[in-house]
Amino acid sequence: MATLHFTKGQGTGNDFVLYADPDGTLPLSAGQIAEICDRHFGVGADGVIRAVRSKRLPEGAEALADDEAAEWFMDYYNADGSAAEMCGNGIRVYVRYLIESRLVQLADGDTLPIGTRSGVRDVQRTLSGFQVDLGRWRLAGGEPLVRAKELPVARLGLGIDLGNPHVVVALADESELESADLTYIPHLEPAPQGGANVEFVVPHEPLVKDGVGRIRMRVHERGSGETLSCGTGAAAAALAVRHWAGENAPGQWWVDVPGGTVGVRMFPTEDGEHVALSGPAELVYTGALELA
């Protein structure tokens, strides 16, 4: 029976079990991951992150081909054991874990490339946490009809791809946002192949202050259920509201989630507009468990 030494971490309440497996010799099964993430019988988490060197995984080899400095791969899994392409909060916590575990060195202001299933993502250490360049984004998936429990009227959502799929839904006010029961999976028509993360948003009043937009969001994450925060979901929500607000909408946003607040910034690059996510990353405790 193997012993798994792990660290519990969180970014605005989006929590993860992280463990180091540099040589790729300790993969977990979907069943083991689901047991670890169970909040009653396991450690409890929204997902599991394995720290593995990119050269030890086929997906990591692709990351190295893209950027030879992407030594580390974020092998991320949802709470149900399914593999995920990307996690905006998770990658910040992952880099904090690599630093605290002395697997990498990263000074304030420096950037570290990390391999993910959606490509290489650059993470910068800041005075207040970490900022990750989520790369190019695109409208994808059209405008599916979204039904959620306790919301009596179906709404049109906006599909956005950030390396993982999102559908963003605008609600009328705070009371609607509070009433949605996200313990149930929102129903999408047409249903995207492989599912999607679904974000429900309302604007602050005023929507824009001092050139910065602000919205409030709740999310149902594919494979994990409702979480206190979703980093790529916050970015998708800000992008959607900017899209709806028109050409004079700002390129910088605060997104309030149940677990705190994250920053989203859109900026031009040579290969198109990118979106960056900034926020805290905390390591909570370490532990060990016996794997069945």
UniProtKB/Swiss-Prot annotation:
Claim: Isomerase is one of the keywords in the record: yes
TM region(s), chain numbering: none
Biological or metabolic pathway of the protein: Amino-acid biosynthesis; L-lysine biosynthesis via DAP pathway; DL-2,6-diaminopimelate from LL-2,6-diaminopimelate: step 1/1
UniProt enzyme class: isomerase
Active site: C87 (proton donor), C230 (proton acceptor)
This protein's name: Diaminopimelate epimerase
One GO term of the biological process aspect: lysine biosynthetic process via diaminopimelate
Pfam family membership, one: DAP_epimerase
Subcellular location field: Cytoplasm
Annotated positions for site Could be important to modulate the pK values of the two catalytic cysteine residues: H166, E221
A single GO cellular-component term on record: cytosol
Entry keyword Protease: no
Source organism: Leifsonia xyli subsp. xyli (strain CTCB07)
Catalytic activity: (2S,6S)-2,6-diaminopimelate = meso-2,6-diaminopimelate
Assembly notes: Homodimer.
Enzyme nomenclature, EC number: 5.1.1.7
Binding-site list for substrate: N14, N78, G88, N89, N164, N197, E221, R222, G231, T232
Signal peptide coordinates: none
Keywords, in A-Z order: Amino-acid biosynthesis, Cytoplasm, Isomerase, Lysine biosynthesis
Function of the molecule: Catalyzes the stereoinversion of LL-2,6-diaminopimelate (L,L-DAP) to meso-diaminopimelate (meso-DAP), a precursor of L-lysine and an essential component of the bacterial peptidoglycan.
Family: Belongs to the diaminopimelate epimerase family.
InterPro entries: DAP_epimerase_AS, DAP_epimerase_DapF
Example of a GO MF term: diaminopimelate epimerase activity
HAMAP family recorded: DAP_epimerase (MF_00197)
